[in-house]
Amino acid sequence: MRTFEAAAYLRRIGADTVEVRKLFSSTMEAYQRKAMLVAHAKVYRGCAIAVSPDHDAPDIQVTAAQAADELLNISGVQASFLVFGLNGGMSFSARSMGQVNVQIIMEKLGGGGHHTMAGAQLAGIDGDKAYELLIAAID
């Protein structure tokens, strides 16, 4: 809803919607990576979870956040988690529609944030271990 309100506000004050769209464009590689993450997500207890096979991919933090947002559009998904490799460890990008407090889940992994948007970083682990720890934090 906030995106729609922001777009309506920008239009009201005379912003060029084509120029705004250009600001939010991404490379084909980043778009394909986001689509792959969404396509390979699994749902566990109302939470969509995707683990990126790419480590230190270009713009992975932005791509993961966008994919996490996109997963919330799936019926029955109350929260989403993207797990991705960055700087020799694993990072988490978490989003929620409000029913699940992702801040609390990310705090269990040493991270933090807000009720509907949070994250964490863990050094020295791989994607499988990160997934396992995330499942335990959700439980």
Language-model segments: residues:
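Hydrophobic helix-and-loop "lid/oligomerization" segment in the mid-to-C-terminal part
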Residues: 1-139
